């Protein structure tokens, strides 16, 4: 958003077609730049060696002197995953987040980055002043504690960035939405509401489909033998549900991987998880039929740990036909193909595979009724659907129009587009900032350009032929060879004529 008393919003990521993940929104108020979230997304094609994708932040580098900070809504990778890459380029940029959000971010930072990082812990409902502008975080319900939305107060009105949220009256403590604070902000006047679109096509409220304790209970009851359960480390609510249900049985949970163990222990110490430690087993319990083995997924390679176990590479766990493999999350955008392949591989081993259905079980994102409630609380003059694919954003726009926001006050944008406001009114801005995406290869830890990807694609489709020989340096006579080496071209034993 640009004000003259100006502000603009530029979606460097998360604002265009096929854009689940890599969220990054820039709000520029009289040259004061506020960045909301900086996340990654996964490559859904399972090829070309790409681990994950982040937004191009050349614009931020160019304008780094004007950046007031990066404001993180919560600790999921779609919202914090690009921060380490930004800090590589702009080490001093202030990063604001709640206690747990910053703890999750610290896990992604290299030791040298952590020393230099300018991390600023915030508390919900405590205003942060930046001259004539200010930021006010409000607690919201998501699958991780300490999630917030942000209200950016400007001279011409408030911009509200919801982040990811649901309305669920059963949630308490660090998961609870402060509806009173949201309503108070709405009464003061909201110029523009930026609301997520992930489930905008789904009717009703997301709750109670975001809670799966009953399904976990059913899996535990129907499968008396050993269960190997995958869990996303940042989905604290699901981890809590798992521990709650296991504690009602005679089973023990064995937590595999030091990273997951450390995270759970720290979360328990900080009060974000409640765990009966007598239910936590050790490696000696791995072979017991009534054990639940908890394994985590890694950032760069979803299902990587489970894949290692399936292929027999794991030192401690070998899958048996009596085992049940329990995928505790519905496949989210970006990993659908990999999830389907994993389920096939489990079936080939003869083990039982159980997963959450994306039709019956929902993630903690706002459905249509949640969006309607948020819009009614905020009563914004302008509405800006963000996150999700374009069809989700279009559905979100329809929700807003359905409850009374004029069509001309609903903003649909592509990555790099600018929504400009002058003295509180949306202008017909044609400005566009050139942005693209950065493809990260975990091996090289750098941006993989289009030319490299094209070469990889050609090699994958056509193979390679290498001709080598040894030459005399002075006479250029052939001393040895030539030798022909092929990979992925033809099967040599059956192609002697060639």
Which stretches of residues belong to each language-model region?
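Hard-cation-handling environments
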Residues: 201-328, 332-379, 384-498
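His/Asp/Glu-rich metal-coordinating catalytic cores
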Residues: 1-71, 76-285, 304-318, 337-340
């Amino acid at each position: 958003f640009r004000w003259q008393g100006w502000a603009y919003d530029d979606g460097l990521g998360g604002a265009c077609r096929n854009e689940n993940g890599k969220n990054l929104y820039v709000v520029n108020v009289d040259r004061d730049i506020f960045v909301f979230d900086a996340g990654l997304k996964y490559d859904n094609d399972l090829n070309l060696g790409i681990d994950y994708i982040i937004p191009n932040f050349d614009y931020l580098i160019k304008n780094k002197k004007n950046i007031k900070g990066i404001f993180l809504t919560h600790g999921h990778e779609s919202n914090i995953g690009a921060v380490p890459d930004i800090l590589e380029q702009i080490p001093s940029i202030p990063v604001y987040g709640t206690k747990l959000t910053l703890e999750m971010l610290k896990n992604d930072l290299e030791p040298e980055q952590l020393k230099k990082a300018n991390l600023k812990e915030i508390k919900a409902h405590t205003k942060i002043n930046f001259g004539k502008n200010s930021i006010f975080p409000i607690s919201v319900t998501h699958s991780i504690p300490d999630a917030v939305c942000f209200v950016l107060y400007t001279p011409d009105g408030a911009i509200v960035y919801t982040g990811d949220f649901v309305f669920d009256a059963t949630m308490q403590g660090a998961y609870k939405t402060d509806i009173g604070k949201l309503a108070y902000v709405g009464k003061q006047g909201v110029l523009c509401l930026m609301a997520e679109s992930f489930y905008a096509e789904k009717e009703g409220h997301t709750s109670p489909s975001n809670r799966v304790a009953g399904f976990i209970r059913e899996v535990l009851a129907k499968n008396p033998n050993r269960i190997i359960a995958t869990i996303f480390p940042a989905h604290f609510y699901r981890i809590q549900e798992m521990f709650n249900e296991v504690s009602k049985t005679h089973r023990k949970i064995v937590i595999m991987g030091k990273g997951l163990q450390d995270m759970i222990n720290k979360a328990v110490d900080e009060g974000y998880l409640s765990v009966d430690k007598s239910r936590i087993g050790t490696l000696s319990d791995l072979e017991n039929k009534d054990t639940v083995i908890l394994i985590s997924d890694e950032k760069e390679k979803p299902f990587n740990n489970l894949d290692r176990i399936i292929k027999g590479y794991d030192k401690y766990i070998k899958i048996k036909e009596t085992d049940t493999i329990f995928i505790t999350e519905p496949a989210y955008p970006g990993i659908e193909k990999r999830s389907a392949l994993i389920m096939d591989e489990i079936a080939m081993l003869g083990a039982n595979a159980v997963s959450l259905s994306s039709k019956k079980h929902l993630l903690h994102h706002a459905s249509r009724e949640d969006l309607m409630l948020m819009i009614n609380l905020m009563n914004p003059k302008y509405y800006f659907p963000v996150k999700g694919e374009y069809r989700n954003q279009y559905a979100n726009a329809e929700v807003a129009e359905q409850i009374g926001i004029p069509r001309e006050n609903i903003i649909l944008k592509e990555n790099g587009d600018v929504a400009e406001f002058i003295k509180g009114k949306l202008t017909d801005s044609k400005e566009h900032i050139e942005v693209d995406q950065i493809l990260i290869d975990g091996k090289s830890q750098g941006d993989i350009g289009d030319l490299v990807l094209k070469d990889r694609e050609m090699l994958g489709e056509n193979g390679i032929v290498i001709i080598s020989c040894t030459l005399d340096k002075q006479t250029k006579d052939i001393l040895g060879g030539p030798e022909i080496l092929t990979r992925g071209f033809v099967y040599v034993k059956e192609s002697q004529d060639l």
